[in-house]
Amino acid sequence: MNDQKTTNTGLLTSTLKTKPKHNLKPSSEAIKKAVSKKEGHYKNKRFQKHNFNNKSEFEERIVKLKRISKTTKGGRNMRFSVLVVVGNKKGKVGYGIAKALEVPLAIKKAIKKAHNSIHTVEIHKGSIYHEVIGRKGASKVLLKPAPLGTGIIAGGAIRAIVELAGFSDIYTKNLGRNTPINMIHATMDGILKQLSPKKVALLRNKPISDL
């Protein structure tokens, strides 16, 4: 009996000795390769998602933040509405409005919409080429070129647009309703309606020297 137990113990010991050992802990090189591969994947994913512009160069400004409510059978549903303007002060500007239950989420959504609606505007010596009136609904905004050193003569929502677009000398005046979103629409309408000498030459089918 004792001899049989000794034999079984010997077989078990030999089996354990001959069983291959599996190294469950990965090496440091394998860990580094996996981490670098994962980081590269996320970097490429972010680049593909946001390759329309470089957000780091854009400045963001909140023009209007207000609380809104909707009355239903269950009571009032409170939310926040945010109007944001973004621009790089080099001829690119956009704006967005969004609503959410919390202020940070509303701001984030508005900024995303603003970045998705970027417009490229023409700037002539820090101002615009000629006098123009932009319209949106009952809002009208007058834009006039100003000499060097005048500065930005504007306020509120109009100032946010012209400043972040990159204008340094310009006269503006609100001629209608002062609803922030409509004023921004009207200002953008006026800025985009201006005609440079090159555009006028193309419309008239003449060289710039003949204008």
UniProtKB/Swiss-Prot annotation:
One of its GO terms (biological process) is translation. Residues 58-121 form the S5 DRBM domain. Signal peptide: none annotated. Keywords: Ribonucleoprotein, Ribosomal protein, RNA-binding, rRNA-binding. It holds the Pfam family Ribosomal_S5_C. It comes from the Bacteria. SUPFAM superfamilies: dsRNA-binding domain-like, Ribosomal protein S5 domain 2-like. One of its GO terms (cellular component) is cytosolic small ribosomal subunit. Coiled coil: none annotated. The N-terminal domain interacts with the head of the 30S subunit; the C-terminal domain interacts with the body and contacts protein S4. The interaction surface between S4 and S5 is involved in control of translational fidelity. Belongs to the universal ribosomal protein uS5 family. This is Small ribosomal subunit protein uS5. It comes from Mycoplasma genitalium (strain ATCC 33530 / DSM 19775 / NCTC 10195 / G37) (Mycoplasmoides genitalium). The gene is rpsE.
